[in-house]
């Protein structure tokens, strides 16, 4: 019987995928369990244990500051982890060994719920560990595919994100109840157990992974080529201004020293960074649903169909909506739009996601205005905002994870994912600094209550308009092999 050509064979799902998705679900349970109770725990345990109304707003600002600072470190470290994985040790070793450090950080956290300094140390260890593996995990998903099954990659990234939010749903439903009934020690201890489970699941799949070896520090790497091009650009600018002379373009000169493939890779990175430059402000707003929105929920009527939820549980609606919307978007909305003749490109998805983020925060701002006026509005308005924000996350976050992998050269896969995650870090440090200013009566102290949310809406709206101008000028090129 003649062999069936590769292009006619049915694409097969890599056998390693279940282990990666199982590991991610358990690890995300651990991470989001900590985040679920952190804002209210910090206020009640450290910043306003006497429940003094006079210092409540300052206590909430300090809680928000520390919460966003934690996320800043958690998403800054992927840059380090990505470089170490790509250049030195490979993704598998980095994920495995840093996961063990992650579990140790969880142990420190559960034993230090009455000591802010030690508790903060545990948070730093967890942030370093979570960040160290973050870029490697999503890039490791892409490594499992080649040209024979690359059409399945988009769906697997959807299921990968599904696993993240499955862990998030379970943790944000269960951990607040455990925190209320049994105290913070157990509430922070259970995530440690799940982190140990995540490490075990990942180790069990060790013989099934496609392990892309590290490339080493090559002479033709991104930094060296970029610095060389920058030096030539200054030289050419000097000649142009003072001598009105320019024989060649910058990249033509760079091509005399470096290979076309290396230069193409560097240019690809800059194309991606032009898109990722707009993600920090998205995350500056998005991450507030796990801190500012949680504290806002303490001032809402939390009755839903006769049952009163805990403030920390309302954030569960975000991953629930995500789990529902991922297949709706992937298998329903996107194909339907394509049938109308409109191509659903990654850049268009991201733009639509930024717009939906603005809409969700407008609802939150109006809700806060009612609270500022002395009202106790229904939580259903916040749930609507969570629904819209979930749609925005599907369009921005999942798309950017895939975009970081498919649009970057082989030697930059983990590092490009890390640069995207760095945007989350930058967004959170900005929000943390705003809250630090509020807590210390600084410049942003005037932006409290509803004006706080309107401030962020205004900033994102400006970035959204700029994105529309930039995105339509960017070419796209896939590097999947």
Predicted regions and their residues:
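Intracellular loop-helix junctions on the cytosolic face of multi-pass helical membrane proteins
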Residues: 1-22, 147-148, 154, 175-316, ...
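A gly/Pro-rich, aromatic-decorated transmembrane alpha-helix motif that marks the paired
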Residues: 36, 79-83, 165-181, 365, ...
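Short amphipathic helix-loop junctions that connect adjacent transmembrane helices
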Residues: 36-62, 291-311
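Central cavity-lining transmembrane alpha-helices of secondary-active solute carriers
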Residues: 65-86, 316-331
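C-terminal ends and interior cores of transmembrane alpha-helices
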Residues: 100-117, 355-374
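Intracellular juxtamembrane helix-capping segments at the cytosolic ends
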Residues: 132-147, 393-408
């Amino acid at each position: 019987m003649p062999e069936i050509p590769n292009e006619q064979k049915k694409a097969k799902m890599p056998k390693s995928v279940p282990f990666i998705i199982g590991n991610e679900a358990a690890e995300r349970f651990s991470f989001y369990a900590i985040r679920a109770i952190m804002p209210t725990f910090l206020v009640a345990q450290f910043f306003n244990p006497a429940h003094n109304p006079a210092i409540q707003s300052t206590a909430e600002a300090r809680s928000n500051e520390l919460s966003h600072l934690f996320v800043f470190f958690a998403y800054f470290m992927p840059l380090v982890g990505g470089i170490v994985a790509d250049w030195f040790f490979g993704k598998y070793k980095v994920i495995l060994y840093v996961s063990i450090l992650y579990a140790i950080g969880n142990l420190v956290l559960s034993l230090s719920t009455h000591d802010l300094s030690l508790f903060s140390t545990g948070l730093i260890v967890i942030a370093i560990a979570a960040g160290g593996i973050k870029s490697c995990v999503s890039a490791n998903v892409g490594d499992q595919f080649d040209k024979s099954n690359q059409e399945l990659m988009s769906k697997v990234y959807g299921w990968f994100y599904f696993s993240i939010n499955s862990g998030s749903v379970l943790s944000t439903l269960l951990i607040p109840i455990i925190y209320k009934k049994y105290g913070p020690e157990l509430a922070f201890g259970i995530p440690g157990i799940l982190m140990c489970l995540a490490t075990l699941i990942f180790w069990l799949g060790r013989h099934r992974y496609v392990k892309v070896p590290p490339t080493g520090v090559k002479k033709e790497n991104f930094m060296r080529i970029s610095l060389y091009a920058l030096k030539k650009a200054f030289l050419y600018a000097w000649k142009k201004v003072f001598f009105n002379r320019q024989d060649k373009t910058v990249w033509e000169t760079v091509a005399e020293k470096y290979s076309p493939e290396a230069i193409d890779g560097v240019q690809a990175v800059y194309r991606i960074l032009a898109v990722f430059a707009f993600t920090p402000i998205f995350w500056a707003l998005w991450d507030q649903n796990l801190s500012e929105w949680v504290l806002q929920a303490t001032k809402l009527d939390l009755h839903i169909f006769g049952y009163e939820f805990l403030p920390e549980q309302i954030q569960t609606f975000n991953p629930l909506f995500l789990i529902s919307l991922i297949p709706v978007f992937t298998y329903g909305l996107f194909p339907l739009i394509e049938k109308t003749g409109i191509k659903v490109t990654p850049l268009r998805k991201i733009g639509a996601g930024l717009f939906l983020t603005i809409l969700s925060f407008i609802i939150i701002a109006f809700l806060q205005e009612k609270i500022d006026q002395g009202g106790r509005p229904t939580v259903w308005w916040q749930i609507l905002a969570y629904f819209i924000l979930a749609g925005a996350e599907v369009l921005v976050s999942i798309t950017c994870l895939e975009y970081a992998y498919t649009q970057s050269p082989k030697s930059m896969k983990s590092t490009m994912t890390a640069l995207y995650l760095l945007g989350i870090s930058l967004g959170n440090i900005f929000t943390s600094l705003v809250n630090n200013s509020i807590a210390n009566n600084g410049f942003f102290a005037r932006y409290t209550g509803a004006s706080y949310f309107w401030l962020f809406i205004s900033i994102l709206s400006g970035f959204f308009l700029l994105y529309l101008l930039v995105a339509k000028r960017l070419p796209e090129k896939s590097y999947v092999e």
